[in-house]
Design a protein with these regions (language model features):
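Conserved functional loop/turn residues at catalytic and ligand-binding sites
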Residues: 34, 44, 168
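Alpha-helix C-terminal capping segments
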Residues: 29-33, 51-57
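Helix-rich "cap/lid" substructures immediately adjacent to catalytic or cofactor-binding pockets
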Residues: 1-41, 118
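Gly/Ala-rich beta-loop-alpha elbow adjacent to hydrolase catalytic centers
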Residues: 23, 38, 42-46, 50, ...
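Alpha/beta catalytic cores of group-transfer enzymes, especially the acyltransferase/condensing modules
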Residues: 4-5, 16, 54-194
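Hydrophobic side chains within alpha-helical segments
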Residues: 19, 26, 47-50, 72, ...
Length: 194
């Protein structure tokens, strides 16, 4: 985390454990200061940290899950030349339409009314950037080497699901919101694994 090169840290097998460690360290500092959350949520990898902080599993289990998640996603990333970009200053409908003009570009994160993250093939991403500019928007390449949150990660998601099924989980000790639905986690350990 602290001594790796930028290239090494761009590899998700390294990035994810580093981010998880930083998130959990920040949580522990807040806890030491007596700050307690009424509820928790995390986006993408952050949901694993939020689940660990909420007591769904212990820190060591969370770290093992993150290591495996990063490795699975790295394997998929190495199969394709993919990337991501943040598209700014265009409405979601325009971004969806532009992505639809390409065979393997996907609007994946709707971060705000005019900030949508797109994942897909790097060759198509470059063409999308030109199309976005013609529409009056801006595409900012993200410093990642994979198309996260897209169909390019389906095998990794299936592998991670198997990992989750083998882990002992508990009900959250505080309200924990799922990033897929925005709803509190279910009151069922079996459903938490989903």
């Amino acid at each position: 985390c602290f001594s790796g090169s930028e290239e090494e840290l761009k590899e998700t097998k390294h990035t994810q454990p580093c981010l998880f460690a930083m998130e959990m360290a920040a949580y522990e500092v807040l806890k030491e200061k007596g700050i307690r959350a009424d509820s928790m949520a995390g986006f993408s990898l952050g949901e694993v940290a939020a689940a660990a902080a909420a007591g769904v599993f212990d820190l060591e289990t969370g770290f093992r899950l993150v290591m495996r998640r990063g490795a699975l996603m790295q394997e998929e990333a190495e199969n394709f030349d993919t990337s991501m970009a943040a598209v700014l200053k265009l409405p979601a409908e325009t971004v969806k339409r532009l992505c639809g003009e390409f065979s393997q570009l996907y609007p994946v994160n709707f971060n705000g009314p005019e900030q949508i993250t797109v994942s897909g093939l790097s060759t198509q991403m470059k063409l999308l950037a030109d199309a976005v500019k013609r529409e009056g928007g801006r595409a900012i390449p993200l410093k990642v080497k994979a198309a996260f949150h897209s169909p390019f990660m389906l095998e990794a998601a299936a592998g991670f699901q198997k990992e989750l099924e083998a882990v002992e989980v508990r009900l959250p000790q505080t309200v924990l919101y799922a990033n897929i639905s925005g709803e509190p986690y279910p009151k069922s350990e079996a459903k938490i694994r989903q």
